Curated annotation (Swiss-Prot):
Its EC number is 2.7.7.6. This is DNA-directed RNA polymerase subunit beta. It comes from Nymphaea alba (White water-lily). It is an enzyme of class 2 (transferase). Signal peptide: none annotated. Keywords: Chloroplast, DNA-directed RNA polymerase, Nucleotidyltransferase, Plastid, Transcription, Transferase.
Length: 1071
């Protein structure tokens, strides 16, 4: 429960993963049944056997394994779907019924995710144009307004109706040639008399057909031929036939005219029709009503549609996507069953339902969906906040949606209908800005695919305010009070007026005319934006960066909750699943680092804790018990904190003392100066767990072997292997060490032996090993402690099944120069220098500050919220208080934030007897001293406690150097990228810079020895070994030779000439 203000109502924030749960439950309860009901009865060619499924009695079996085991064994956490099936013999009139296994359906776990092949995956919501009809206007090539009505089908296909200057109505199917509306209606089965009886403007319909047109609509056959000729773009004179009708029915009327359940509802509402909702196809009546509306638009009646309004969008949730895939799997199963029945009859076998049905179509369909579909993504588990935010994303991208390159600015922009539904702040940066959003805290997906948001209904009859959820199409008809002090206070005088929202406009009206009011200031923000204190004082662009950067924060080894927060930290931590919660009341009878044993209601349960588990971003997930033996607990109490939670609250960073002042230029351009205390006291130390794996295969020469006897490798590299050839638990490993020893057999010819091997065979008769060493070695930057080793084989027990060995290595990373840190207001920076404590600037009580920021980073960025947080954090630290402040507190009175901060600083100054905490001449600022000289700085500066995060962009993952490595085959230049041990590219601008400094020899080295001059590279190697001067490179580098060859392929001959230094005569040389 949250309570906002003294007179506000109480309400509960919905679970942050509720949208995912509701979607999956809707699929299990309704989607499966709907698709199974549509499965057809299958007959053989002689119509003697009939197969059918009885979908209403389907069963889902509880999985045999636990979630944790599915992750470790890299298998799918799924449930088997069983459906009764019947096989009916028409000749004997008897039926054989059996329960058949249709396949496995991946289940959703408590995080709102699915585990597929051991990987947590999540399906995000997609926003699509809702099916129905939309009216718009545009200019033709003559600059004259043209009105069009666009009919969008359920799968996204478009057909257009347009009216020209002569008031003739044309239909354009899939942007191909246009045909008369009368031809389309006749082809759909309406006669001219029926058309004229069902329209409001029959004289307009009669005015434009000439004799030729009247002949085309004289009969249904002529209309179908004309329509087919235009639709299929065929020449000549096609002849009417049943096959032509079937083709048209299949290609156009079934595919492009299916409106679906939502489209039928939208069409009825827009055109004032009363067609039954189960009639989901486009009818002639729809087309004629749409044409009537179009004529009305031409004469200034009716309103145009705003395509970007959320009432014209629909959410394609996890339920819709899973149902679509289930329907696709059943179509594949139908083809398999049909083929199997025909095969059994042909070979005179007696089929049974279990013989006919295979589980492969359903299982493979879902595995390919979760693995390949753009809306199925690997769950981002950097920290607990990231997990819950990922499930609440909404995307315009994906199949049937937009692309980042084609989406217009208008679609990306904030729309008034987003209020309380889609967060106006939290979106991705870059090419997808505005296309990937985040649902607001209170938003939910309704039954018709619309996003709903709650309001309090103000009623004169009842003093109790009722909370109602409204879709985007409904809240336009109400006066909604804006969230200021007037609207949020009861007992207002009737004559007072205040701001309100009505039909996307802002008005000032009397309180008695208000219908609805907001329930909470957070209502229109996402979770990420709602965790920013004093967000109302920040520029929206910086708030956007902060929302994104909080999701990149690394869980620290010693977590700490923020002094200044917004009150949502507890709910975010709870819904993330990072903490262990008591599911019943009872008494703790045993606790240690691995499990907690709880006794209650006469039985005892053991609750296992997460121990050093790796996330897919290589951060650590670990639970620390917070209860002691003998303690009595109630249901819902915290048993253990997660990696980034403290006391059940989200704790992503640390409260550190900061000062805003320049320091010798080390914090210019967003750089950050930090104290060595943060390093030595493990303030910003984090653990990272990396996974390395290797498989053994059976080759044509025999099986690969895991062994610790590896020839031609130094014993030092094998020092950590046990007798099986696998690294020992607890070993400290460095770069290049062997983690798993593996030999691959190969055939060796006599000529491929080394000379010493041939000598041993000839003199002593010793058989030299023909196996090739293919060990798993620790790559660069992977040093650490081995914390887990898993050796397993895929199920089946065959020798051909590969063995899989996984080694988990933990790294302890202290903060260092090059790491990225950020606050909660978009204030980010790279650590530029780590100063000794005695050199840092210190406060008047002798305390050195921990971080020094550049004050120039505040005014131009307009993120002043960090000033309020910084000063209030200092007061809270001195008073031992934690603050949870709702944003937009200026709605109570002007300058409310500043008054709160100054009053708390004044109280802290009085209680601690430190007058420097609040000095009236420059409140919030203080004079501080230079740690190197002891002299005070010239100006007082802002000091305080800020909550700073360490982000996942760490220098250990990015820094890279190359001494030797692989070269590209074509250009002979070093490869690109850190993963391939690539080189640093010297491009045009870098060459110009070197030219500008006149460093000719360095430039020549860059472009020849260090790059693609093959002969010069070899000479450098030889000269380095034997000693001596390195000769100048002669001839052209390989990339120039490549250019010459490409020009020759275009019949352009190119040679180069070398001018001799001695006689300046030109010696012609072939490239």
């Amino acid at each position: 429960m949250l309570r906002d203000g003294g007179d506000e109502g109480m309400f509960t924030i919905p679970g942050f993963s509720q949208i995912q749960f509701e979607g999956f439950c809707r699929f299990i309860d309704q989607g499966l049944m709907e698709e199974l009901h549509q499965f057809p009865k299958i007959e053989d060619t002689d119509q003697e056997i009939e197969f059918q499924l009885f979908g209403e009695s389907y069963q889902l079996v509880e999985p045999l394994i636990k979630e944790r085991d599915a992750v470790y064994e890299s298998i799918t956490y799924s449930s088997e779907l069983y459906v009764p099936a019947g096989l009916i013999w028409r000749t004997g009139r008897n039926m054989q019924e059996q329960t058949v296994l249709l396949g496995n359906i991946p289940l959703m776990n408590s995080l709102g995710t699915s585990i597929v092949n051991g990987i947590y995956r999540i399906v995000i919501n997609q926003i699509l144009q809702s099916p129905g009809i939309y009216y718009s206007t545009g200019l033709d090539h003559n600059g004259i307004s043209v009105y069009t009505g666009t009919i969008i089908s359920d799968w996204g296909g478009r057909s257009e109706l347009e009216i020209d200057r002569k008031e003739r109505i044309w239909a354009r199917v899939s942007r191909k040639q246009k045909i008369s509306i009368l031809v389309l209606s006749s082809a759909m089965g309406s006669s001219l008399r029926e058309i004229l009886d069902n329209v409001c403007y029959p004289e307009i319909f009669l005015s434009f057909p000439n004799e030729k047109e009247k002949k085309k609509i004289g009969s249904k056959e002529n209309a179908i031929l004309e329509f087919y000729q235009k639709f299929a773009c065929v020449g000549g004179d096609p002849v009417f036939s049943e096959s032509l009708c079937k083709e048209l029915q299949k290609k156009f009327f079934q595919q492009r005219c299916e409106l679906g359940r939502i489209g039928r509802r939208n069409m009825n509402q827009r055109l004032n029709l009363d067609i039954p909702p189960n009639n989901t196809f486009l009818l002639p009546r729809d087309v004629l009503a749409a044409a009537d509306h179009l004529i009305g638009m031409k004469f200034g009646m009716g309103t145009l549609d705003d395509m970007n309004h959320l009432k014209n969008k629909r959410i394609r949730s996890v339920a819709d996507l899973l149902q679509d895939q289930f329907g696709l799997a059943l179509v594949r199963l139908e083809n398999v069953v049909r083929g199997t029945i025909c095969g059994a009859i042909r070979h005179k076998l007696i089929p049974t339902p279990r013989n006919l049905v295979t589980s492969t179509p359903l299982t493979t369909t879902y595995e390919s969906f979760f693995g390949l579909h753009p809306l199925s993504q690997v769950l981002d588990r950097t920290n607990p906040l990231t997990q819950i935010v990922h499930g609440r994303k909404s995307s315009y991208l994906g199949p049937g949606g937009l692309t980042g390159r084609t989406a217009s600015f208008r679609i990306r922009d904030i729309h008034p209908s987003h209020y309380g539904r889609i967060c106006p702040i939290d979106t991705s940066e870059g090419i997808n800005v505005g296309l990937i959003g985040s649902l607001a805290i209170h938003a939910r997906v309704g039954d018709w695919g619309s996003i709903e948001t709650p309001f309090y209904e103000i009623s004169e009859r009842s003093k109790e305010e009722q909370m109602v959820y409204l879709s985007p199409s409904r809240d336009e008809y109400y006066m909604v009070a804006a969230g200021n002090s007037l609207a949020l206070t009861r007992g207002i005088q009737e004559e007072e007026v205040g701001p309100a929202r009505y039909r996307q406009e802002f008005l000032t009206i009397a309180w008695e005319q208000i219908h609805l009011r907001n329930i909470y200031p957070f209502q229109y923000f996402s979770i990420g934006a709602s965790l920013i204190p004093f967000i109302e004082h920040n520029d929206a662009n910086r708030a956007l960066m902060s929302s994104n950067m909080q999701r990149q924060a690394v869980p620290l080894s010693q977590s700490e909750k923020c002094i200044v927060g917004t009150g949502l930290e507890r709910q975010a931590a709870l819904d993330s699943g990072g903490s262990a919660i008591a599911e019943r009341e009872g008494k703790i009878i045993y606790t240690d680092a691995e499990k907690i044993v709880l006794s209650g209601n006469g039985d005892t349960i053991s609750i296992p804790l997460v121990m050093y588990q790796r996330s897919n971003k290589n951060t650590w997930m670990h639970q620390k018990p917070q209860v002691h033996r003998g303690k009595y607990l109630k249901k819902g109490q915290i048993l253990a904190d997660g990696a980034a939670t403290v006391g059940g609250e989200l704790a992503l960073g640390k409260n550190v003392s900061v000062a805003y002042m320049p320091w010798e230029g080390y914090n210019s351009e967003d750089a950050v100066l930090i104290s060595e205390r943060l390093v030595y006291d493990d303030i910003y130390t984090s653990f990272h767990i990396r996974k390395y794996e290797i498989q053994t295969h059976v080759t044509s020469q025999g099986p690969e072997r895991i062994t610790n006897e590896i020839p031609h490798l130094e014993p030092y590299l094998l020092r950590n292997l046990d007798r099986n050839g696998i690294v020992m638990l607890g070993s400290w490993v460095e770069t290049g060490d062997v983690l798993v020893g593996k030999l691959t057999p190969q055939t060796a010819k006599e000529s491929s032996y080394a000379p010493e091997d041939r000598l041993l065979r000839a003199i002593l008769g010793i058989q030299v090993s023909t196996a090739k060493e293919t060990c798993l070695k620790l790559p660069i930057g992977g040093r650490g402690r081995v914390i887990d080793v898993r050796w397993g084989q895929k199920k089946g027990g065959s020798i051909y099944n590969p063995e899989m060995i996984r080694v988990y290595i933990s790294q302890k990373r202290k903060i260092k120069v090059g790491d990225k840190v950020a606050g909660r207001h978009g204030n980010k920076g790279i650590i530029s220098k780590i100063l000794p404590r005695q050199d840092m600037p210190y406060l008047q009580d002798g305390t050195p500050v921990d971080m020094v920021f550049n004050p120039l980073g505040v005014p131009s960025r307009m993120n002043v919220g960090q000033m309020f947080e910084c000063s209030l954090g200092l007061a809270g630290d001195l008073l031992g208080r934690h603050y949870r402040i709702t944003p937009f507190d200026e709605r109570y009175e002007q300058e409310a934030s500043r008054k709160l901060v100054f009053s708390e600083l004044y109280e802290a100054s009085k209680q601690t007897a430190n007058p420097w905490v609040f000095e009236p001449e420059y409140p919030g600022k203080s004079r501080i001293f230079d740690g190197r000289t002891g002299d005070p700085f010239e100006q007082p500066v802002i000091i305080g406690k800020s909550y700073m995060l360490k982000l996942i962009h760490q220098v250990d993952d990015k820094i890279h150097g190359r001494s030797s490595g692989h070269y590209a085959l074509v250009t002979q230049q070093p490869l690109r990228g850190r993963a391939k041990q690539g080189g640093q590219r010297v491009g045009e601008m870098e060459v110009w810079a070197l030219e500008g400094f006149g460093v000719a020899h360095i430039l020549q080295e860059m472009l020849t020895y260090k790059s693609d001059h093959i002969r010069a590279r070899q000479e450098v190697l030889g000269t380095t070994i034997v000693g001596g001067t390195i000769p100048n490179p002669e001839g052209a580098p390989e990339s120039f030779r490549l250019l010459v060859r490409e020009l020759r392929s275009l019949s352009l001959e190119l040679n180069h000439f070398l001018v001799s230094e001695k006689n300046f005569q030109i010696n012609r040389k072939e490239v």
